[in-house]
Structure formats: C-alpha cells, structure tokens
Amino acid sequence: CIRDRAANGINRPESGKRTAPSALNKQDVDVYVVLPEGSYLYDAKNHQLTLVSEGDHRDAVAGGQTFVKTAPVSLVLVSDVSRFGDAQKTQNQLVGAMDAGIVSQNISLFCANAKLATVPRGSMDATQLKKVLKLKDAQIPMLNHPVGYFK
C-alpha cells in the first residue's frame, strides 16, 4: 500500500488532498491493484485495499503483451470523468487522461526510488477491465503500470 499512497494517496489529512494534484481537485483518478489472487480498489481515505473481483485478471491488463501477465502486480488508473460533469464531453475525458498521467508519474518515480521495474502503458483490454473492476460507464481505464523486479 505504500506504493499506492505515493501514487495517489492522501498526504494532507486535514484537507483530504492527495499526492497527485487533479483538475479542480475533483480527485477523479482511482487506483486499482491487480494481483494473481484478485483485483482491489485502493481506498485512499482509509489507506487500504478493497476486494473488487476474485481471480487472476492480469490478461485484461496485458492487452496482448504477454510480459505483463508475469508481473507480480499491475496498477490500473481509472478516471471517473463524471466528477467533471458530462462524461461524454471530450474535454472532460482529456482532463481525466491528464490527471491519470500525473498519478502515473508518481508511480514511475516511486518505483525508480524503490528499485522496482515499471512502465506506463495505455495498452489493455479496457472492455474486459470495466467488467472485472465493476466500473460505471463514466469510469475510464486510462493507463496501467505492471510492477516487478529488474532481471
């Protein structure tokens, strides 16, 4: 969970603000943790993982790139663009993608410091992930980070 807190956790409890800024402080990006035994939502407020779906769903994250299936953990960054208003509005989707990019940067920096291997990726089976993670229409998987060890 330390990695999740660094990615998008609350670092100013008095205001509820996070380690990654977001447009209008809407905090639209949620971090999902995909492990071999299940997929979890990172609850920033309580600094804990909540089980969303049992089973190994790393195939959905892999999106055809087999190396991702062997990563011990993958982080999926989901923007709930409804927090900006109209979820169908292109500008809101672009802002959600930007916010996910900021969280992605935090993950990359944390992993570099912790000597973990990661790569930000846009490739994934978003349709399958939406089912597995039980996402609403306005929740869009934007990026993912397989995390592992250097060979």
Where are these regions (language model features)?
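Small-aliphatic-rich amphipathic alpha-helix that forms the alpha element of a beta-alpha
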Residues: 3-5, 31, 73-77, 81-83, ...
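Solvent-exposed loop/turn segments at secondary-structure junctions
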Residues: 9-11, 38-39, 80-84, 126, ...
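A residue-level signal for beta-strand positions that form part of recognition/binding surfaces
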Residues: 28, 72-74, 142-144
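A glycine-rich helix N-cap at a beta->alpha junction
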Residues: 134-151
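A short, hydrophobic/aromatic-rich structural module that often spans a beta strand
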Residues: 54-57, 127-132
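Short, surface-exposed helix-loop/turn micro-motifs enriched in polar/charged residues
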Residues: 23, 118-121, 137
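N-terminal amphipathic, basic helical "cap/leader" segment at the start of enzyme domains
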Residues: 4-71
